[in-house]
């Protein structure tokens, strides 16, 4: 006679099923939390930056096209699945088990799709997502080995006999949660105006660290001949293989159009690759030194190469692609050219000039992107609305100061005029 409790009442499979459910819940919670922190930081100190590795990077996932569905972070659906699996282990029943087996089958299919998308399209893996994948596969394997219908040995009997009542109940609860999640997401997005004002205030309160002793001659935006003459002066310590640097580049592409003629952006090479950067303890982004040399080889073509690298972000990790890039731009000698290496090294070394911001790191510049905006340092990047607010404040300050200088007349001059 076939038993009717979860995973045939076997103790360890049932405990493991509970652990897999709780694991999916925990991983989903941190995924959702990171999604909102990355996309809607509450303060200037929560900006996203790269200092883990090129592959294991959660920001790439948080900024991707599939991070949300109609405003719902996909981690929410993982949270629901994990909750159902954990509850099924605590309150076992034949119907609950068959329903969870069906859900676990669909869940593992989704995991496969997301894994393929992350690895082959994004070229990275979020550690929180990886944790969810592991627990999801564990749950599926447990239902496969110990679930109902094992004596029949057929896929249909194991995974395609859910309880319609439980499915409907789960769908209703999920729908209520979806509504709440959408409302919360909208509230976070709508609150960005108020957050932007707070960001501007926090930016003003940052200590003035000043510009580096050597400002890179490689500018992505030039509004004035002299760097300090623009209302917005941005020095961008960046790595061509950093996903957060890609995000910042996309933000700046929008902002440079809106603030045309008012912004200078100097690209300060800072590859997180120990081949050319002594600050980096290990090769976080192998190949980024090569890309820096290629981009720096011919200053006249820097912007072209810069844009092409970021437009082919995933391909840029491939050594063959980098060789072809160098060939097309006539920069085959870049990797051995002492002049190119010297200027890139000079730019990198300016990162050592800043006082360290954490006891964990020896220098102030230690991750990418790091921005020096009008002499103030921001580690990481910020959402478009917040960056725009900071830029607008700088422009208004500059124009107000300019107007004051133009219309201000000394007291003695006014007396003479009378």
Feature-to-residue mapping (PLM):
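Functionally engaged cysteine thiol sites
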Residues: 49-54, 58, 129, 275-278, ...
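Conserved redox-active cysteine motifs that mediate thiol-disulfide chemistry
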Residues: 49, 57, 127-129, 237-251
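Catalytic His-Asp charge-relay segment
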Residues: 233-235, 370-371
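Membrane-interfacial helix-loop segments of redox and metal-homeostasis proteins
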Residues: 2-189
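Structural alpha/beta surface segment adjacent to cysteine/selenocysteine redox centers
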Residues: 235-238, 246-328, 361-363, 405-418
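Short pre-active-site segment immediately N-terminal to redox-active cysteine/selenocysteine motifs
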Residues: 73, 125, 238-241, 367
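C-terminal cap of thioredoxin/glutaredoxin-like
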Residues: 150, 253-256, 323-418
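Membrane-interface segments at or immediately adjacent to transmembrane helices
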Residues: 181-229, 235
